[in-house]
Amino acid sequence: EPKLLIGLTSSSSAEVMKGCAAEAEGLIIPTSFAPITDVAKEVAALANANGGDADLHSAAAWENVMIIKRVIEAVGVTGDPANIEEERLAVRNGLEALETTEGLIGQITRVQDEGEALKPYVFVQAQAGNWTVIHDPR
């Protein structure tokens, strides 16, 4: 029997716990989402209240939508059809200029010349049918 099982990041979802919790027991997975901050807990509760689950995929989608929302507000998009080209360019430039933003579990940094996002992470472990945070490097 293995002493340590490390799982694929995208497996840290509610579906795994619903479908094969016993088989996943003890599995350790690095992930970019767990409800460890007030805002992450709020988003997880909203997802549950609406029949969903918050995981690294849906949390990333939430973060992306909120980033776009903040940029739209910051550049002053009006929605006026006469300004569509200028406003599209302003949003594009606003997104490109972002170097850091607040994510659900901490600050997200962007490597400008690569376009790669550096996100905080935690390690979760499958324990009794739930994902339990076992390492939080904050």
Residue ranges of model-derived segments:
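Extracytosolic ligand-binding ectodomains
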Residues: 1-138
